[in-house]
A protein has these predicted regions:
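Membrane-embedded alpha-helical bundles of multi-pass integral membrane proteins
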Residues: 1-292, 297-298, 337, 341, ...
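Iron-sulfur-cluster electron-transfer modules
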Residues: 2-135, 303-312, 334-340, 347-579, ...
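Iron-sulfur cluster-binding electron-transfer modules in prokaryotic oxidoreductases
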Residues: 173, 179, 205-212, 216-217, ...
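Segments forming glycine/polar-rich beta-alpha architectures that bind adenosine-containing cofactors
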Residues: 233, 316-319
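Acidic/polar loop patches that form or flank catalytic/metal-binding clefts of enzymes
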Residues: 247-250, 263-266, 333-334, 420, ...
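Short, charged low-complexity linear segments at domain edges
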Residues: 270, 276-307, 345-391, 636-645, ...
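Cysteine-cluster motifs in flexible loop/terminal segments that predominantly coordinate metals
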Residues: 318-321, 407, 665-666
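Cysteine-centered loop/knuckle micro-motif
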Residues: 325, 411, 707
Length: 783
């Protein structure tokens, strides 16, 4: 060995020892931080299902489906990482002997083909990702409003560029080494090298004229550079366990494996149950037995589960959640990404103190008698630090969330933002009684009257007045819900809100026309509890939900049809947690089946003039309700229903299906003022109006209310009669940033008929539920 080789060997050995040691230190720090979290039940099995899901996610990269370039680029870079580790191992041998190769597989041409193919692909992929980041990164000199439009706003760009530069340097070194190996073997008279160097022989040939000594020196230097760069990455990453853009390479595998849904799918639909520190679910029956020091929800960092802490460590700061968040898009301070980063940094700073205190208190001084570790931790000033009071999560951030699930849907590493935000809300509501003042009235109305409007139960059947047929009530007109085809769950909005009543009446008329027998509960209904649960009042939710489950079981409910997407999600996805298991259909699903079966027949344009066809020949755009679409994957039936209306033209908004933009009502936001930034409903209404649609079709009463008011607000701000000024996706309509007023759906004291009319003026698109549009398109004699 030459002097250079000895020097290079010493350098790579030292770099490796330091790199591996510091990287191991980082691993230990992350594991210890995650372990301060609470138990997260059900995250380990079934193993086979979870492994299959993990493999499918890794191979398919399904969360990147709307970004094909990023999908391919990220995939090849990701796959090259473990594949090219073999070249790193070979590099150590090349420092000692430039012609050294891995035993057995070192000169197998299939292996060499794979190495070269992925090396080139990774090089192109990392360049593409670098250019993309450079192109959409926020400009430092730009105003904040403009910088916020970048999904990388708030991300650590220096760390990201470091990671990308490291990948580029390592992959480039691999290719250079391959070319130098070709040149060395060519000088040695080897034949058939084209088979072994399929993608590097073309430039390796340029070096074949060099001397053997020079080529061997070049191999040693290139191998040393590759190893030192790799170990430098390990050093930097090991020293920064909060560097998610690097650590996600390892943590994402664990996070995806431990996802909430073992068979796949995002953590949407039902919320995780409220649990104690040991993972025991909290219900109404267990409240009396709770210890005095029990903490409900996530008030401090140690109240989060280990999976929630792993979520924060895994965040790669890609900003896809931020890019899709309706609150962030309308100028509010909530960014799901920044919430995760804030929790991550706080956990990393707090965990060492919590661990040290727990360890010190594990054994009484001078004895072997064990003591309560948690009690010892609670004496530490770093323990129990209120996440909101300490400024880790600002109240405006916490309460801006609509729980639409866009962040969860977009996250490529399965972070469960909504569950974490609601857990923090639970603590604030249940333990601190700290919540927006409007919610106080909503909670009271839910508790006393069983609906957020605060109206009497006897008014729940007012919507049926004037129908030319009787609506049977279970217990009065029919003995059991099992005696009819469907129990029609009307919901609070469908019973009390004037615009939603139109949907309720339309569904009843359509079911009657199709010969489907149904009955309602009348004053036996109460709110499903969705607004209480999303607002963090889990105990009020359980009170309402338990009452409903008991009633539904008593009346023998088997098949239930609902018009509200929130009721649909709660009854079908959350009531099973309380023992209520029913077959639940959204009205668009049932009506679509009835149309497909020929039991409902929309009229052709011009047929039976004056007898129907009120919406035919019109341009319709459809708004996907979050709790029907993203949370429950119901996208096709509503569109098939619209397609069944003769002459109707469907004009999709730019943001539709999985990427649909929230109306602003979810997460109990329907009952809170919206005084920060632009109104979400107006932004969505502007996007709908930009399609040139005559009708904005909805499939949820909350969406109908919010978009009706949004359309009216946009039309008023335009100042014109047509109200159809172009407004692209994400546009912020002028004049729609005022606080919610008496015509807004956001006030707790808003009456059942509050808000602007569905059609505010001539030329302004109508906002109507699909059921209303379908009913209007049928022949009058049918109804």
């Amino acid at each position: 060995m030459s002097v250079l080789q000895w020097v290079c060997l010493a350098v790579v050995v030292a770099a490796t020892v330091v790199g591996v040691a510091l990287f191991s230190r980082g691993v230990v720090a992350i594991v210890r931080t995650v372990r301060i979290g609470r138990v997260a039940p059900g995250r380990s099995g079934p193993v086979g299902t979870r492994l299959a899901t993990l493999l499918r996610e890794v191979v398919g990269h399904g969360r990147f489906q709307h970004r094909p370039v990023v999908r391919v680029a990220h995939w090849v870079v990701m796959v090259s990482f473990p594949l090219l580790v073999l070249t790193l191992v070979a590099g150590y041998g090349q420092v000692v002997s430039p012609t050294w190769a891995l035993p057995l597989i070192g000169h197998l041409w299939p292996v060499e083909w794979v190495v070269e193919a992925f090396a080139w692909a990774a090089l192109l992929g990392i360049v593409a990702l670098f250019v993309l980041r450079l192109r959409i990164s926020p400009r430092a000199a730009a105003p904040e409003v403009e910088r916020r439009r970048s999904r990388f706003f708030g991300s650590n760009q220096a760390q990201a560029y470091f990671v990308e530069a490291t990948v580029f340097a390592v992959v480039a070194a691999v290719l250079v080494l391959r070319g130098l190996e070709y040149a060395l073997l060519s000088q040695a008279g080897e034949t058939g090298l084209g088979l072994h160097f399929p993608l590097t022989a073309w430039f390796g040939g340029f070096w074949a004229g060099g001397s053997t000594a020079a080529l061997e020196t070049a191999v040693v230097v290139a191998a040393t550079v590759k190893i030192v760069v790799s170990m430098s990455w390990f050093v930097v990453v090991g020293l920064q366990p909060t560097m998610g853009v690097a650590w996600h390479r390892f943590l994402a595998v664990v996070n995806v494996y431990a996802r909430r849904e073992p068979a796949g799918g995002p953590a949407l639909g039902p919320l995780v149950p409220l649990t104690l520190a040991d993972g025991t679910a909290v219900d109404l029956a267990a409240l009396e037995d709770l210890p005095d020091d029990a903490r409900l929800g996530a008030g401090a960092i140690e109240d989060l589960s280990w999976k929630q802490l792993l979520d924060t460590a895994t965040c790669t700061e890609c900003g896809r959640c931020q890019d899709q968040c309706p609150a962030w898009a309308t100028g509010k301070p909530l960014s799901p990404k920044l919430v995760m980063l804030s929790l991550r940094d706080h956990a990393a700073a707090t965990a060492p103190y919590l661990r040290a205190t727990a360890a010190a208190g594990a054994v009484t001084e001078g004895t072997a008698a064990p003591v309560d570790r948690r009690a010892a931790v609670e004496d530490d000033p770093h323990a129990g630090v209120d996440l909101v009071a300490a400024g880790v999560i600002d109240p405006d951030v916490l309460w801006a969330c609509t729980t639409c699930g866009a962040c969860v849907q977009q996250c490529p590493v399965d972070i469960e933002h909504v569950d974490t935000i609601v857990d923090v809300r639970r603590y604030q509501v249940l333990m601190e009684s700290a919540f927006p003042k409007e919610l106080g009235g909503t909670f009271t109305k839910l508790e006393r009257q069983g609906n957020p409007w605060g109206l009497p139960a006897r008014a729940r059947l007012d919507w049926a007045k004037g129908l030319d047929f009787d609506v049977p009530v279970v217990g009065a007109d029919v003995e059991s819900a099992a005696d009819v085809d469907y129990l029609f769950w009307v919901g609070c909005a469908g019973a009390y809100e004037d615009r939603a009543k139109k949907t309720t009446r339309a569904v009843a008329e359509l079911l009657h026309a199709a010969g489907v027998s149904f009955a309602v509960l009348g004053d036996g209904e109460t709110c499903t509890g969705d607004p209480a649960r999303r607002a963090g009042n889990e105990l009020l939710y359980q009170m309402l939900a338990s009452q409903n489950v008991e009633v539904l079981n008593e009346v023998g409910a088997q098949r239930i049809v609902v018009t509200c997407a929130h009721c649909f999600n709660t009854i079908s996805r959350e009531y099973p947690q309380l023992g209520g298991r029913f077959t639940v259909l959204h009205h668009t699903e049932l009506l679509n089946t009835l149309v497909a079966d020929g039991r409902l027949v929309p009229v052709e344009p011009g047929a039976d003039a004056g007898a129907g066809g009120g919406t035919v020949g019109q341009r319709i755009t459809y708004h996907d309700p979050c709790y029907l679409g993203r949370h429950n994957q119901v996208y096709t039936p509503p569109r098939e229903l619209l397609a069944a209306i003769p002459g109707a033209e469907l004009a999709e908004m730019p943001r539709n299906r999985e990427t649909s933009f929230c109306c602003g009502a979810g997460g109990a936001r329907m009952w809170m003022e919206e005084s920060v930034g632009t109104r979400i409903n107006a932004t969505r209404a502007a996007e709908a109006m930009s399609t040139g649609a005559d009708v904005v079709a909805t499939a949820c009463p909350y969406c109908t209310v919010m978009l009706s008011d949004g359309v009216a607000a946009v039309a008023a701000s335009d100042g014109g009669a047509d109200g159809t000024a172009a407004a692209g996706p994400g546009a912020e309509p002028v004049g729609t940033d005022a606080p919610a007023g008496p015509t807004s759906p956001a006030g707790p004291d808003r009456g059942p008929a509050g808000g602007a009319p569905a059609r505010a003026s001539v030329g302004v698109p109508e906002v109507a539920d699909i059921a209303v549009l379908l009913r209007d398109s049928l022949r009058a004699p049918t109804l």
